[in-house]
Amino acid sequence: IGFGRIGQEVAKRAIGLGMNVLAHDKYTSEANITLNFFNGDKKTFTIESTSLKNVLKGSDFVTLHIPKLEDKAVIGAEEIGLMKDGAGIINTARGGVIDEDALMFALDKGKLAYAALDVFTNEPNPSIHLMMHNNISLTPHIGAATLEAQDRIGEELAEKIIAYFNK
């Protein structure tokens, strides 16, 4: 859910692992995902965006790569209810995108098998219930702290400045 740069990178890895990828994005109707193999071969897959409902109903793994734009969670009890029994959800997007109470309820009742979170509604201190739950894996949101990520941010900023002054 969310099929921009990060969502497409996750899709690339999922396809490489043999998974069928479903995507939902308000702004991207389709994307071409190219896998580069060790022998120089390339294979491109076109992934078309579908409805949120289709993604939730059809996925064993749901990953979130969306901004937090509203006060309401994007994934709440209703959305979790659409998900496959035993599915898992991964949020590396923003805290508050998932209703944590609805998530805990679904995990406790066995609707969902697991959750992986590196962002929380109450950052930097997730609730004790999240931290202690056996079916939730928590990690710090530090993906942008790598040297490669910082280099990419610098390059993107420089490109935007150059593009601005070339207008």
Regions found by a protein language model. Give the residues of each.
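Glycine-rich Rossmann-fold phosphate-binding loop(s) that bind the pyrophosphate
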Residues: I1-G4
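N-terminal Rossmann-fold NAD(P) dinucleotide-binding loop
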Residues: G7-Q8
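Gly/Ala-rich phosphate-binding loop of Rossmann-like dinucleotide-binding domains
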Residues: A11, I15, L107-D108, M131
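Residues at the starts of beta-strands that form the adenosine-phosphate
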Residues: G16-N20
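Short beta-strand "acidic-cap" motif of Rossmann-like dinucleotide-binding folds
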Residues: V21-D25
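Rossmann-like adenosine-cofactor binding region
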Residues: K26-I128
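C-terminal helix-to-coil terminal segments
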Residues: N39-K43, Y114, V119-K167
